[in-house]
Regions:
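Basic, flexible Lys/Arg- and Gly-enriched helix-loop patches that mediate nucleic-acid binding at interfaces
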Residues: 1-237
Length: 237
């Protein structure tokens, strides 16, 4: 269910603020009944009229993108940089589910379905996010143990569910480490490694929930299947 004013705005009829004004003015009907309360929630099955005109509901769209470097995870950018939304040709008002840093690559979901996005981002869903990080320096067991014990970020102790050293390159003094987290704090993975003394040179999200980058090259995307969408809704607690 979504708020009435959001559904009206999503249909393209007017802005959300104007939609709120129309609701309080008694110019909106839901299933033939005038509604004036802004907190009213509606479903896809409800019939909504604005000033006696039936609105066309926005069709829900769901995408999986292999985000490339040098693209911002927003719907617009005041610096004129390319956004993740620019990479997907659609008229739907899609937006990213969560965010990846400008130079971070990998799994990113986009949709215009607020409920779908909220399920994936809500802490109760405990969605796993798997990252591969290239670190400056060679991480040791003591550092991995320190991460597993938990590090303090934003006055909160956060712990990865898994940390694995995958590759060591003594010639370049770098290593590849796979780390799995549940939270989605700002710059979380980079800050976690920095807390134990390592700079992240490259970062890629390999997986989120059950979505991975199979058959998707950098910058490519695909639509989710109805089965995948239903599986996300099954995560709701």
């Amino acid at each position: 269910m979504e708020r009435l004013q959001k559904v009206i705005a999503s249909s393209g009829v007017t802005s959300r603020r104007k939609a709120e004004e129309l609701i309080t003015a008694g110019k909106v009907k839901v299933n033939g009944e005038v509604v004036t309360e802004l907190g009213t929630k509606v479903t896809d099955k409800d019939r909504i009229e604005v000033e006696n005109v039936l609105i066309a509901k926005e069709v829900k769209e769901y995408y999986l993108l292999n985000k490339p470097r040098g693209v911002v995870t927003t719907t617009s950018d005041d610096k004129g940089r390319k956004t993740v939304v620019d990479l997907i040709p659609t008229n739907a008002r899609i937006y990213p589910v969560g965010r990846l840093d400008y130079d971070t690559t990998g799994v990113l979901l986009l949709t215009n379905d607020g409920d779908f996005a909220n399920i994936l981002m809500h802490p109760a869903s405990e969605v796993e996010k798997v990252y591969m990080a290239k670190l400056k320096g060679i991480i040791k067991g003591e550092h991995i143990n320190a991460l597993k014990d938990g590090v303090k970020l934003d006055d909160q102790i956060v712990k990865p569910s898994r940390v694995k050293l995958k590759k060591v390159d003594p010639k370049t003094n770098t290593c590849m480490v796979q780390i799995t987290i549940h939270e989605g704090k700002n710059h979380q993975v980079k800050r976690m490694f920095e807390s134990v003394g390592f700079e992240v040179l490259k970062l890629k999200r390999e997986k989120e929930a059950f979505f991975d980058l199979k058959d998707l090259q950098s910058g490519e995307f695909r639509k989710l299947t109805p089965k995948e969408v239903a599986k996300v809704y099954g995560l709701q607690k």
